[in-house]
Amino acid sequence: MLHTIGILIWIIIKILVIVVPLLLSVAYLTYAERKVIGYIQVRIGPNRVGLKGLLQPFADLLKLITKEIIVPTRSNKYLFVIAPLFALVPSLVGWAVIPFQEGVVLANINAGVLYLFAMSSLGVYGVLIAGWASNSKYAMFGALRSTAQTVSYEIAMGFALVGVLLAAGSMNLTDIVNSQKGGMLHWWFIPLLPLFLVFWIAGIAETNRAPFDLAEGESEIVAGFHVEYSGIGFALFFLSEYASMILISTFMAILFMGGWLSPFEGITFLDQIFFVVPGFVWLLLKISFFLFVYLWVRATFPRYRYDQLMRLGWKVLIPVTIVWLVVTSLMVVAHVKPWF
């Protein structure tokens, strides 16, 4: 009995070690977004609360927590309240299979890629439930847009994943990282460049980020699926969006950029200098790079029209992935490096 309780406590501690830093990362990602976009637009960004505005995320959280939760009169109250949790939970439980470095993973399962792909796709159910339960036409339009967008881009994302599985020969995330050993030139983003770009574009669309933020297009459908949410409900949707961004960036770093591996492997003098850097630091740097690109894209590109969004998904991304999957399959069968 005591042994079982001890195991349970240890599992809870490991979960908290992942979730607490993740929630803090989400808080400061919002701060980084406002700062980065501010500098791109030749503004300063938040600079009043704390040193250089570093306490701004906590001020925003306090504001949202103290706001009144308003439930629309004819809405489905139970689904309305629970929908933000449906959106948030998948972006948190996906971290169970993320390897931070060799052996440092909560659950080292053989179907890690499949599990993570499923978790990254489940968030759309929260969006759909929120749109329907709100009893608002704007919320419903936003939810339908988001659902159609996710279904469209999941296909391209799934095909891009298959390319990595063919090249690495495993669905275990640790094995996929180990298959990229040998330095930056051995990372999968080089031989699978078209699939890498498609996966990245589909990842932006999956998380409803600009320029694919049709689900919450302010100029067309007010705030989209969360137009009726205020206070903590809105905060949970906000949290789920940024947590999903971090999860997709981590997925990208593991699949295509060598995960925790150093980019200087194979370059003797640089490898000796950076040998002391822990693997998880390299992973965090790669995640930070992808998150910066997220913010850069948001500040640079205008929002797509809905028909353009669908056309890009079905007529461009899916054909590209199918063609490159055929190429990858032929290279693997022919034992051509670095595909094999």
Curated annotation (Swiss-Prot):
Catalytic activity entry: a quinone + NADH + 5 H(+)(in) = a quinol + NAD(+) + 4 H(+)(out)
TM region positions: 4-24, 78-98, 113-133, 151-171, 184-204, 244-264, 273-293, 316-336
Location in or out of the cell: Cell inner membrane
InterPro entries attached to this UniProt entry: NADH_UbQ_OxRdtase_su1/FPO (IPR001694), NADH_UbQ_OxRdtase_su1_CS (IPR018086)
This protein's UniProt keywords: Cell inner membrane, Cell membrane, Membrane, NAD, Quinone, Translocase, Transmembrane, Transmembrane helix, Ubiquinone
Family matches, as PROSITE patterns: COMPLEX1_ND1_2 (PS00668)
Subunit structure: NDH-1 is composed of 14 different subunits. Subunits NuoA, H, J, K, L, M, N constitute the membrane sector of the complex.
UniProt xrefs under PANTHER family: NADH DEHYDROGENASE SUBUNIT 1 (PTHR11432), NADH-UBIQUINONE OXIDOREDUCTASE CHAIN 1 (PTHR11432:SF3)
Any one Gene Ontology molecular-function term assigned to this protein's record: oxidoreductase activity, acting on NAD(P)H, quinone or similar compound as acceptor
Similarity comment: Belongs to the complex I subunit 1 family.
Broad enzyme group: translocase
Lineage: Bacteria, Pseudomonadati, Pseudomonadota, Gammaproteobacteria, Legionellales
Biological process according to GO: aerobic respiration
Organism of derivation: Legionella pneumophila (strain Paris)
Topology in membrane: Multi-pass membrane protein
Chief location: membrane
Designated name of the protein: NADH-quinone oxidoreductase subunit H
Any one of the GO CC terms: plasma membrane
Top-level taxon of origin: Bacteria
Cited function: NDH-1 shuttles electrons from NADH, via FMN and iron-sulfur (Fe-S) centers, to quinones in the respiratory chain. The immediate electron acceptor for the enzyme in this species is believed to be ubiquinone. Couples the redox reaction to proton translocation (for every two electrons transferred, four hydrogen ions are translocated across the cytoplasmic membrane), and thus conserves the redox energy in a proton gradient. This subunit may bind ubiquinone.
Gene it is expressed from: nuoH
Protein EC: 7.1.1.-
